[in-house]
């Protein structure tokens, strides 16, 4: 079973994200549980939590179909001790919010060394940050997203993801989300079926499909191996539709939320319908 949706707005309350997902006939969705560009947010009230859970029940979304994303401000590998602590506190809050909402996944960008510490040191800090957050929360899996490798962001090589996982003590509560645009920009080709075979074989060898907890399905405005993160609508970018058809037909991608973050929300319903049709072929 393929779970397909988009990252929908939670404007007006997290329960509104559920309704917006239903309106585009999504069978999965992503959301921010707080303002993604602010460090702090008001705690979730019992009323807000109850409305969200009721909406999920009404529209038949389980936690396996929902991939919340954390704040863009958080850097779990920050080289500065004070800034690192601030990020860790914010990440624990994000995990706790997911736990309160009955959600079992939290997607996040791993972190950046800011050209101040070695890659290995940054990756170790990220793993330690995850360990701290897992110890403070229950039932939520930390889902590391691969990056395009812009600036000093780590996570653009599968080896980075594997190194972080290696440092996480509770392997049952860590996973990865593969963003197709980020992978392509990071140097993993997806333009042909043969490219997809090679890229996902490498992913399986280095990380392992057992850790795959979600996908971000995005075409790329950016060039192959450019280390530039620019999303595009499916079939309109430099990846093309072949990769997305391949993913829809491959059972290794069953049972996880697959989320559009493509640039035109007006055609998300059409993109979802096309992906569903490919999954049926």
Curated annotation (Swiss-Prot):
Entries under SMART domains matching the protein: AP2Ec
Enzyme Commission number, as recorded: 3.1.21.2
Cofactor dependence: Zn(2+)
Catalysed transformations (reactions): Endonucleolytic cleavage to 5'-phosphooligonucleotide end-products
Binding site for Zn(2+) 1: 69, 109, 145
Residues binding Zn(2+) 2: 145, 179, 216, 261
Enzyme class: hydrolase
Cofactor remark: Binds 3 Zn(2+) ions.
GO terms, biological process: base-excision repair
Binding of Zn(2+) 3, residues: 182, 229, 231
Keywords: DNA damage, DNA repair, Endonuclease, Hydrolase, Metal-binding, Nuclease, Zinc
KW Metal-binding (keyword) present: yes
Name of the featured protein: Probable endonuclease 4
Taxonomic lineage of the native organism: Bacteria, Pseudomonadati, Pseudomonadota, Gammaproteobacteria, Enterobacterales
